Swiss-Prot record:
Family: Belongs to the DMRL synthase family.
Keywords, in A-Z order: Riboflavin biosynthesis, Transferase
Residues at the catalytic site: H93
Name of the protein in question: 6,7-dimethyl-8-ribityllumazine synthase
Record-listed (2S)-2-hydroxy-3-oxobutyl phosphate binding positions: E90, T91, R132
Pathway assigned to this chain's UniProt record: Cofactor biosynthesis; riboflavin biosynthesis; riboflavin from 2-hydroxy-3-oxobutyl phosphate and 5-amino-6-(D-ribitylamino)uracil: step 1/2
Enzyme Commission designation: 2.5.1.78
Stored Pfam families: DMRL_synthase
InterPro entries xrefs: LS, LS/RS, LS/RS_sf
A GO BP entry: riboflavin biosynthetic process
Gene3D superfamilies per record: Lumazine/riboflavin synthase
Catalytic activity as recorded in UniProt: (2S)-2-hydroxy-3-oxobutyl phosphate + 5-amino-6-(D-ribitylamino)uracil = 6,7-dimethyl-8-(1-D-ribityl)lumazine + phosphate + 2 H2O + H(+)
Amino acid sequence: MAIFEGSFTNASTLKVGIVIARFNDLITNKILSGCLDCLKRHGLDTSELSNQVDIVWVPGSFELPIAAKTLMKKKSYDVVIALGAVIRGETSHYDVVISEASKGISQVSNENNIPIIFGVLTTDTMQQALERAGIKNNLGWNYALQAIEMGSLIKNLN
């Protein structure tokens, strides 16, 4: 029986794309910082001159799937991380954005056979988002770990 798992020891060989929503940038900037910190600590070059990590900013989480799709067609990535923050308001807009963003990201990932980490915070309040972006825990770090694991796993399977 063969058992396959992702590895955290060869992360420095990965090529990572990050698509990030500018909407709620107080939150998304913090998530991005946590994500980049994790990637750097695992051996990836996150400097501005890096050839390992590319960052694409989009207006909001709804636009993440098309940016990820375009990015993946342009260059070869081992994994893409989609970052955003959608906070529930008084209308149904929240439900539409989350539904379409999650479906779109999943579809793009499956069509391209490249993992996309769903790093879109979905919270009811700004306080909850702040807690997940650094006050108590920075989920950006977790999203980067998932990216390292999945990027490594897919490389091993191929």
